[in-house]
Amino acid sequence: MDPQDAKKIASLRRIEAQDDSAMADVIRRVMTEFGAVGQGYSIEDAEVDGMHAAYSSGRSAYFVAHASGVLLGGAGIAPLLGAAPGICELRKMYLLPEGRGQGLGKRLMLRCLAAARELGFSLCYLETLEHMQAARGLYCAFGFQDRESPLGASGHSGCNTWMTLEL
């Protein structure tokens, strides 16, 4: 798919059960692209193969971006494990290369932060890798601030960058 086509016709919606396989593929492809494979990375999370079920109840939401029947990526929010009830985590925000640079990351972020506020969260936390510069740029553009150490108990010991945003 041409990146300009993705920009023109991509739409966002909540994840559906039939998206699970395609979203798992996106996660695995992007994590592998950035060398984030193995223990300590979200690629190993059990929810990767069942994203719809993982984000369909409680105070969580997951959104996918798609165009012309192709799932380009997604992002979600959920309570941060091991943290206060008012803290959510931005989780599994990944876009395939053909979905990048078209504003889809910004649209996904806006949707996730709106959902976080609607669900009553007051702080959004995320974990990433220092070398994921485009992602870090997006997070900074939204006002996320670096932390010196992780928050909560995500189990993602492979991440080396932690950020928060007051909602």
Q: What kind of feature is each model-predicted range?
A:
Residues 1-3:
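Short acidic N-proximal helix/loop "leader" segments that mark the beginning
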Residues 7-97, 109-111, 115, 150-152, ...:
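Acetyl-CoA-dependent GNAT
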Residues 8, 29, 122-125, 129-167:
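C-terminal "cap" of GNAT-fold acetyltransferases
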Residues 37, 102, 118-122:
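Short coil/turn segments at alpha/beta junctions that flank glycine-rich nucleotide-binding fingerprints
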Residues 96-98, 102, 130-131:
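Active-site acidic-Proline motif in GNAT/NAT acetyltransferases
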Residues 102, 106, 110:
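Residues forming the Rossmann-fold NAD(P)(H) cofactor-binding site
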